[in-house]
Structures are given as structure tokens and as C-alpha cells.
A protein has these predicted regions:
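A contiguous active-site-proximal alpha/beta segment in oxidoreductase catalytic domains
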Residues: 102-147
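Short, well-ordered coil/turn segments that N-cap beta-strands
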Residues: 32, 93, 120-121
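Short loop/turn motifs at secondary-structure junctions
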Residues: 31-34, 68, 145
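N-terminal Rossmann-like dinucleotide-binding module
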Residues: 1-52
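Beta-loop-alpha module in the N-terminal Rossmann-like domain of NAD(P)-dependent dehydrogenases
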Residues: 21, 54-114
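Conserved G/P- and acidic residue-centered "switch" motifs that form tight phosphate/ATP-binding loops
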Residues: 13, 99, 144
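Short, Asp-centered acidic motifs that coordinate Mg2+ and/or phosphate
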Residues: 36, 70-71, 121
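Acidic-histidine catalytic/liganding microenvironments
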Residues: 28-29, 66-67, 131
């Protein structure tokens, strides 16, 4: 049986949700290794790296060029998801994006095509903002059943 090597990840976007990801990743050092973090607000990337490990990438391009990074976890603002994920896929990195995958349907299709073309995986967190539960609540309120 071959030795299992942890998946080497970089986090891009170190806002509020990054703490939940960092805490979870840190509990599985045999499965994932945090290589570093990037954020346009460098202090946020520094805080993430101090709390969860890895280096601070000064530029987004440095994350994409790092041959040690196998997976990019995209936690950027919604409007940046497609661009950041696209860069990572083109660089041959697997991508896990926080929801939504993209803000435009055509961008989402392009991401799927890039993942297939570059033989890498693309995943996205469950869509909860406008999920079934929220739609049911909205309908019940709209229909006057409650509220």
C-alpha cells in the first residue's frame, strides 16, 4: 500500500468564513497540509497564517505559481469567485469554492469546462442562501401563512 500524503492547500480570501475552514483543516494534519494564505488585505492573511499555519502569499499569482499547492480553497467575495477559481484551474490546481461557484451561469459552465480540460477537480460548498428551506420560509411569509 502506498504512503498517503496530505493534500497541500492554500486559502485565498481570509475573511470571516476562513476561520471555520482553518479550524477544520487544522484538525486533519494527516489529510491536509495548509501551505499558506492570500488576501488582498495582507493583515488578514497574516492572521490566518498565524492561527492555522502556512506562509503568507504576497500576490495571488504566487499562490497559483506555487508547485507545492495542489488545492486552492476560494473564500473570496462572491464577485471574485469565478476569476480566482479560473486562475487556479488554469494553473492546474484543484479548487474548492465557497458558495456560489460563480455569479453568472455562463461563468459556472466555463469553470466546469476548465476543470475537465485541465484534469482537476472543482467543488463548491452547499448552496444555502437561496436553498429549499429559505424558499419555503419566503413562500409561507409571502402567502400570509405566518408573519
Amino acid at each position: 500500500m502506498a504512503d498517503f500524503k496530505p493534500l497541500r492547500v492554500a486559502v485565498v480570501g481570509c475573511g470571516n468564513i476562513s476561520g471555520a475552514y482553518g479550524s477544520s483543516l487544522k484538525t486533519k494534519p494527516d489529510v491536509v497540509q495548509i501551505m499558506g494564505a492570500f488576501d488582498v488585505l495582507t493583515d488578514q492573511a497574516k492572521a490566518f497564517a498565524n492561527n492555522y499555519g502556512g506562509r503568507v502569499y504576497e500576490k495571488l499569482e504566487n499562490v497559483m505559481a506555487d508547485p507545492e499547492v495542489e488545492l486552492v480553497i476560494n473564500l473570496t467575495s462572491h464577485h471574485a469567485h469565478a476569476e480566482v477559481s479560473s486562475m487556479a484551474l488554469i494553473a492546474g490546481k484543484h479548487v474548492h469554492s465557497e458558495k456560489p461557484l460563480s455569479t453568472k451561469r455562463e461563468d459556472g459552465k466555463k469553470l466546469l469546462e476548465l476543470a475537465e480540460k485541465n484534469k482537476v477537480r472543482l467543488s463548491c460548498s452547499p448552496f444555502t442562501f437561496l436553498g429549499e428551506s429559505q424558499q419555503t420560509v419566503r413562500k409561507v411569509i409571502h402567502d400570509g401563512v405566518i408573519g
